[in-house]
Amino acid sequence: MAHLLLLHGPNLNLLGTREPEVYGRTTLAQIDAALVDRAQAAGHALDCLQSNAEHVLVERIHAAREDGTAYILINPAAFTHTSLALRDALLGVGLPFVEIHLSNPHAREPFRHHSYLSDKADGVICGFGADSYRLALEAVIARLECDA
């Protein structure tokens, strides 16, 4: 059994009501519940955390190195384009991670095209709405099974 960590960045607590034409109508609670269930069905544990504060996400990433986390799934949201702190935290703990986005940042405004995480992530899944999370988890589960 692997311990997985799912991190959600700023404004994702508003999913379901914030710009549903871009982000869909699925709530964050629905996404988390579905992923926890799927992880458990595959024999893994999944912890979820959403924060609008960069330092909270950084501190949780730091804690992941000590708590047995095997893999991080992260939707950094707006921090994708601005946060060297998240990049450095992820590199500092040395855990594999996958970057997730509900929308396709490359099909949006030019300032959303750059990610400070993508070049260090094992993979990036974007543009499939709430299914982006499910697809990312399936990829992580497959990776863990290959490594077992």
From Swiss-Prot:
Q: Which InterPro entries match?
A: DHquinase_II, DHquinase_II_CS, DHquinase_II_sf
What Enzyme Commission number(s) does the record list for this chain? Answer: 4.2.1.10
Q: Which UniProt keywords apply?
A: Amino-acid biosynthesis, Aromatic amino acid biosynthesis, Lyase
Q: Which Pfam families match?
A: DHquinase_II
Could you tell me the Gene Ontology terms of the biological process aspect for this record? amino acid biosynthetic process; aromatic amino acid family biosynthetic process; chorismate biosynthetic process; quinate catabolic process
**Organism superkingdom:** Bacteria
Site (Transition state stabilizer) at 18
Q: Which pathway does the protein contribute to?
A: Metabolic intermediate biosynthesis; chorismate biosynthesis; chorismate from D-erythrose 4-phosphate and phosphoenolpyruvate: step 3/7
Task: Identify a single GO molecular function assigned to this protein.
Answer: 3-dehydroquinate dehydratase activity
Instruction: Enumerate the SUPFAM superfamilies for this protein.
Output: Type II 3-dehydroquinate dehydratase (SSF52304)
Respond yes or no to whether keyword Lyase is given for this record. yes
Q: What does this protein do?
A: Catalyzes a trans-dehydration via an enolate intermediate.
Kindly provide the name given to this protein in its UniProt entry.
3-dehydroquinate dehydratase
